[in-house]
């Protein structure tokens, strides 16, 4: 590799660096050698990541060699030169500018990125260099943990709590192996990213999370996300020592926002209410344990028997603190116009002091909250969500992050930070949306409009100064969009002696930039608030896009100011037919709001652009979205970028208003000649930096080229043009006539295509978060359903979605549940069948109807599976094949396998198990209604899974295909390609040789119906039907519909949705406690709803009825154990209960293996104990519940939010 000497340091570079790259590395070395901070801007595509790595690692190696040389010389001469500088040992040593006594270790390099996924790209660049340092990548448990039980936890904080619990008890064998195997392991390559850590940890049976933390001690360079550095809590949790380190923030244009957000919070009424409910649950649980201990004549009350080492008095005090905090927030008077009230930052200490949360008590409170969270870690159910408690812990740590000096009151700290913070209390506006959540504790809090406590930091200098105070040697901020550098440095309020604003490496024939103030029809283009939704402006913008799509080859990017503007534009273009015109030229792909589905959409876009038969594609995205931040649209993926407006922040948002006021106040304090940003300047910079990030997608390397269209008349203003990057401004031209702009850009692109070298073909994939195996990228990019999904505008524009007529809608779970319970056929008892058997049971296809539904795809993937491994949840092996001999996508089995892989990636493990069970049940029973009910629950409620519902068409039997297409169209608005003339032919082909090989010979004629099966029909399942697939009418079925209708009328749609979801889960897991917890929470709030709880007995399985009767007696306040309580419907096999709930041969749940106990159900601990209730000891002698005298009785009452 070429070597260049910069500032006395020899740098190995993969190729001869360009002048701007040499200048960039020189500035980096200047920061390192002088131990000063630097702000370095270099346009996207100039190789700044490579320059950063090579220059910093060269300096680190240079310093290591210099110190080694000094030590060798000392030993040879037998003299100590501790007081002499390294310069005495030659120019090589002098380049560092440090003395030997300054070092005990070589300074570590900390490379911080915005997301968890970006370090993978940086490590990929590192592997292309000559340097092989010791590397460590720090990630979260969500990316690194391989423990099955911890991975099942739904939230990140629950994963953390359960992990800590297992580590403390030494019950995680993966963690136990880290210390034993860390030194023994043979790491083939020293440069490991997240995926390598996970693979290596799984192979060696040791925890990747703690393995990476061990590797941190010996690492030369450490990669981590921003928040691990900027958030004091994260720094402490990951034991990050910053003393003497070199800290690099890549993509640093986001640092200001992340600094402020890491020191801010919003506390909602739901957060406090959920925390109170959890504490109340623990309080009653511990009181019950204490009572049982007294009844057993234990002379010491020991609550540790339940796993929680806390006194009842301490738990009660914690509950009182939260109650007082809630009262203090509610007591704040607000103006009547819902604007909220703003107070200085020091007010937060006054407010918390009313709840007895101070610098003196914070330690005990945090310790108590942590103990409760650890105690509940690993529990499942609706009443064990500890997110509220975890948020309260985080809030206390944020407020009291800086301890006051010894002997000084905490109020001095409040006065010191009041200038950087504001307290804003405002009415909660999202309480209606909160009612849709399935958490039973949140629905109570959401019945009233509470107050949100916001504590906002407006100065990123707080976090930056804290970094400097930690002893950071050098701080380097770099990005492609930092201009103007002076104001960017002023915001941080720390010195940055070294600054650089680099030019681009491209020539003038590689970039075309045009400001287009008017559309083809002469209408002014504007995204201003008063014009952005006008029909004239939207129509002109759509016509401009259509014309630009004609001349720009390959990939075209369109950036909107916000999601609402993009959705409104798409809606209008769809209605006016403009979207259809663009799609005819370049298919439209839309950036989803949900980040989880982004990778498959962008992969589908890449695939469409790379297709030789296509004219390219159009990708619609938003400024500040994922597509505009660090994603690669090099070469054909992005030949043109259209920016449709200036993305200003919402001007009336309270946080934006207060930020601008804060900056104006700071500028006023600094005097007339102060250089601080004004609020208006900051407001304009927020828009310009978002635009600069978006246009940076077009030029990604030295030989790339492209065109930039700025389609807003305000870009023609001098102040807006001055905010554009310095490398763009020389190419800028304003076009008063749209036709002239099209003429010039067409000429530019024709010349560029002829003169620029052809791009090297390469597989481009989106950057997904670490821990996601390569299988996801491969399957989703090759699976053509993702293309269909991505270009479906209806998915992304709510107003364009088709409405369901005559069938249960996706958002109407009670209707679908009625269909699930009332329209089922009797199923024959079948022997268990594996997943591959269900996969390969596909009718042979005649014609291209399914090809049309699935789309054409030619993936180069071959899957190697073992049935036993698949059934046990083992990993799939994927082998990439460059030239497969037999493309599997062309076969029915190949498409089926690819579809199943895509489904498994899209669903959780529990939902995927439900899907496979539904598939097997359909195969054995031909029960189409039950199948549709299951698929609707899994796929119809989430728009991003609509394509998977459509893709299931290939598994549907011929006589059900037309019905399935109708249902699919009404649920998703998508057709499956059904052709009536071919249904009879398909039916005949189901008895072909291919099916004979896949089905049991005894089931060929009837697809598994019991009346023709070769196997004996199960007892009680006699059928009088002579048609395949017809339903048998069952008495009592209307009771199910009547019950769900009554629930809907009494409790509302949201509560009915919760009940139906819980009932479906009960069918699957046989967990009575879980379903009763939901039903009881919904039906016991008001006395008139108690009959709904009693009537729920029609769904309870026979082996659960004694326990359910006892629970009902407890909840309804009856003194008996349920003997006098009659449930609606017969006690035994009720005709209203579906067969799936009464079959004794179902897989037993956790409660089927033992007889029902006479103890109270878990759910009862959530509700208030009535005075006449009693707790039974082992001798069954009733005794009133007694609490310790020191415990206030009013604290034992469950918390109920005010109506």
Curated annotation (Swiss-Prot):
Sequence motif DEAH box, location on chain: 250-253
Extent of motif Nuclear localization signal: 151-167, 871-877
Organism: Mus spretus
GO cellular component: nucleus
Stored SUPFAM superfamilies: P-loop containing nucleoside triphosphate hydrolases
PROSITE patterns from the UniProt entry: HELICASE_ATP_BIND_2
Task of the protein: A probable ATP-dependent DNA helicase implicated in telomere-length regulation, DNA repair and the maintenance of genomic stability. Acts as an anti-recombinase to counteract toxic recombination and limit crossover during meiosis. Regulates meiotic recombination and crossover homeostasis by physically dissociating strand invasion events and thereby promotes noncrossover repair by meiotic synthesis dependent strand annealing (SDSA) as well as disassembly of D loop recombination intermediates.
Biased composition (Basic and acidic residues): 1123-1134, 1169-1181
Location of region: Disordered: 998-1020, 1120-1203
Residues that bind ATP: 42-49
Keywords in alphabetical order: 4Fe-4S, ATP-binding, DNA damage, DNA repair, DNA-binding, Helicase, Hydrolase, Iron, Iron-sulfur, Isomerase, Metal-binding, Nucleotide-binding, Nucleus
Full protein name: Regulator of telomere elongation helicase 1
């Amino acid at each position: 590799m070429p070597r260049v000497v910069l500032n006395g340091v020899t740098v190995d570079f993969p190729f001869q660096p360009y002048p701007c790259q040499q200048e960039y590395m020189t500035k980096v070395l200047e920061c390192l050698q002088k131990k000063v901070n630097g702000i370095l801007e270099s346009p996207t595509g100039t190789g700044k990541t490579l320059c950063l790595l090579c220059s910093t690692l060269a300096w680190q190696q240079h310093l290591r060699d210099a110190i080694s040389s000094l030590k060798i010389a000392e030993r040879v001469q037998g003299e100590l030169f501790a007081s002499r500088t390294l310069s005495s040992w030659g120019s090589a040593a002098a380049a560092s500018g440090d003395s030997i006594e300054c070092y005990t270790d070589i300074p570590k390099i900390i490379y911080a990125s915005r997301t968890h996924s970006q370090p993978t790209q940086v490590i990929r660049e590192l592997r292309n260099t000559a340097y092989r340092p010791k590397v460590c990548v720090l990630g979260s448990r969500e990316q690194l943990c391989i423990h099955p039980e911890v991975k099942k936890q739904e939230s990140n904080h629950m994963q953390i709590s359960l992990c800590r619990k297992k580590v403390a008890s030494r019950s995680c064998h993966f963690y136990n192996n880290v210390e034993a195997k860390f030194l023994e392991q043979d790491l083939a390559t020293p440069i490991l990213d997240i995926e390598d850590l996970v693979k290596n940890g799984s192979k060696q049976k040791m925890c990747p999370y703690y393995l990476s933390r061990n590797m941190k001690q010996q690492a030369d360079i450490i990669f981590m996300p921003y928040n691990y550095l900027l958030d004091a809590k994260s720094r402490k949790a990951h034991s990050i020592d910053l003393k003497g380190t070199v800290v690099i923030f890549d993509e640093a244009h986001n640092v200001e926002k992340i600094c402020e957000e890491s020191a801010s919070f919003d506390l909602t009424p739901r957060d406090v209410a959920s925390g109170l409910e959890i504490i109340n649950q623990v309080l009653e649980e511990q009181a019950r344990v204490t009572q049982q201990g007294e009844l057993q004549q234990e002379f010491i009350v020991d609550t540790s028997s339940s796993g929680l080492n806390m006194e009842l008095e301490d738990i009660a005090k914690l509950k009182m603190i939260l109650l007082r905090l809630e009262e203090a927030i509610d007591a704040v008077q607000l103006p009547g116009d819902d604007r909220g009230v703003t107070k200085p930052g020091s007010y937060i200490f006054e407010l918390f002091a009313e709840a007895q949360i101070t610098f003196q008590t914070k330690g005990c409170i945090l310790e108590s909250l942590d103990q409760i969270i650890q105690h509940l870690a690993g529990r499942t159910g609706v009443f064990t969500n500890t997110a509220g408690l975890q948020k309260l812990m985080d809030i206390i740590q944020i407020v009291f992050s800086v301890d006051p000096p010894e002997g000084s009151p905490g109020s001095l700290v409040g006065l010191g930070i009041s200038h950087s913070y504001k307290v804003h209390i405002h009415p909660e506006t999202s309480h209606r949306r909160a009612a849709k959540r399935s958490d039973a504790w949140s629905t109570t809090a959401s019945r009233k409009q509470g107050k949100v406590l916001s504590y906002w930091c407006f100065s990123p200098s707080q976090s930056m100064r804290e970094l400097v105070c930690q002893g950071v040697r050098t701080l380097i901020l770099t990005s492609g969009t930092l201009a103007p550098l002076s104001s960017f440095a002023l915001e941080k309020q720390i010195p940055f002696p070294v600054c650089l604003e680099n030019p681009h490496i491209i020539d003038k024939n590689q970039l075309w930039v045009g400001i287009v103030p008017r559309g083809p029809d002469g209408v002014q283009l504007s995204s201003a608030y008063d014009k952005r939704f006008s029909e004239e402006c939207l129509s002109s913008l759509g016509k401009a896009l259509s014309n630009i799509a004609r001349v720009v080859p390959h990939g075209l990017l369109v950036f909107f100011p916000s999601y609402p503007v993009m959705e409104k534009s798409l809606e209008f273009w769809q209605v006016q037919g403009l979207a259809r015109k663009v799609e005819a030229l370049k298919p439209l792909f839309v950036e989803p709001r949900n980040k989880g589905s982004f990778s498959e959409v962008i992969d589908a876009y890449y695939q469409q652009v790379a297709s030789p038969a296509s004219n390219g594609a159009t990708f619609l995205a938003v400024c500040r979205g994922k597509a505009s931040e660090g994603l690669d649209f090099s070469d054909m993926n992005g030949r043109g970028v259209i920016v449709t407006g200036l993305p200003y922040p919402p001007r009336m948002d309270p946080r934006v208003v207060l930020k601008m006021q804060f900056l104006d106040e700071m500028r006023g304090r600094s005097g007339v000649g102060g250089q601080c940003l004004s609020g208006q300047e900051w407001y304009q910079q927020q828009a310009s930096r978002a635009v600069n990030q978006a246009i940076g997608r077009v030029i990604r390397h030295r030989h790339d080229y492209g065109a930039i269209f700025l389609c807003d008349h305000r870009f023609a203003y001098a102040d807006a043009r001055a905010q554009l990057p310095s490398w763009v401004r020389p190419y800028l031209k304003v076009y008063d006539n749209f036709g002239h702009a099209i003429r010039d850009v067409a000429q530019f692109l024709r010349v560029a295509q002829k003169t620029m070298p052809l791009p090297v073909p390469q597989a481009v994939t989106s950057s997904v978060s670490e821990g996601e195996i390569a299988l996801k990228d491969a399957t989703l990019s090759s699976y053509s359903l993702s293309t269909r999904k991505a270009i479906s505008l209806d998915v992304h524009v709510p107003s364009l979605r088709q409405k369901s007529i005559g069938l249960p809608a996706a958002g109407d779970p009670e209707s679908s549940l009625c269909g699930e319970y009332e329209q089922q056929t009797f199923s024959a008892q079948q022997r268990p069948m594996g997943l591959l058997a269900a996969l390969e049971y596909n009718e042979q296809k005649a014609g291209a109807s399914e090809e049309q539904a699935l789309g054409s795809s030619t993936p180069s993937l071959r899957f190697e599976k073992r049935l036993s491994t698949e059934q046990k949840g083992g990993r799939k092996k994927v082998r990439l094949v460059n030239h497969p001999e037999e493309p599997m996508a062309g076969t029915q089995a190949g498409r089926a396998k690819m579809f199943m892989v895509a489904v498994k990636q899209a669903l959780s493990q529990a939902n995927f198990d439900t899907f496979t069970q539904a598939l097997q049940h359909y195969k054995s029973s031909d029960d189409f209604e039950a199948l549709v009910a299951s698929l609707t629950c899994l796929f119809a409620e989430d728009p991003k899974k609509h394509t998977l519902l459509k893709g299931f068409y290939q598994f549907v039997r011929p006589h059900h295909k037309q019905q399935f297409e109708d249902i699919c169209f009404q649920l998703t608005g998508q057709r499956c390609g059904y052709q009536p003339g071919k249904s009879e032919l398909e039916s005949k082909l189901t008895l072909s040789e291919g099916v004979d090989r896949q089905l049991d010979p005894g089931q060929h004629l009837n697809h598994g119906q019991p009346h023709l099966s070769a196997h004996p029909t199960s007892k009680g399942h006699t059928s009088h039907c002579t048609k395949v697939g017809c339903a048998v009418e069952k008495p009592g079925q209307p009771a199910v519909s009547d019950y769900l209708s009554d629930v809907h009328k009494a409790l509302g749609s949201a509560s009915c949705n919760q009940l139906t979801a819980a009932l479906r889960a009960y069918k699957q897991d046989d967990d009575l406690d879980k379903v009763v917890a939901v039903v009881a929470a919904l039906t016991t709030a008001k006395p008139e709803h108690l009959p709904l709880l009693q009537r729920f007995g029609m769904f309870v399985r026979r082996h659960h009825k004694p326990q359910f009767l006892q629970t009902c007696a407890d909840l309804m306040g009856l003194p008996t154990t349920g003997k006098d309580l009659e449930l609606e419907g017969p006690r035994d096999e009720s005709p209203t209960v579906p067969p799936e709930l009464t079959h004794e041969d179902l897989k037993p749940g956790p409660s089927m293996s033992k007889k029902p106990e006479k103890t109270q159900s878990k759910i009862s601990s959530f509700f208030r104990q009535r005075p006449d209730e009693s707790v039974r000891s082992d001798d069954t002698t009733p005794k009133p519940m007694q609490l310790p005298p020191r415990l206030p009785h009013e604290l034992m009452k469950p918390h109920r939010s005010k109506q």
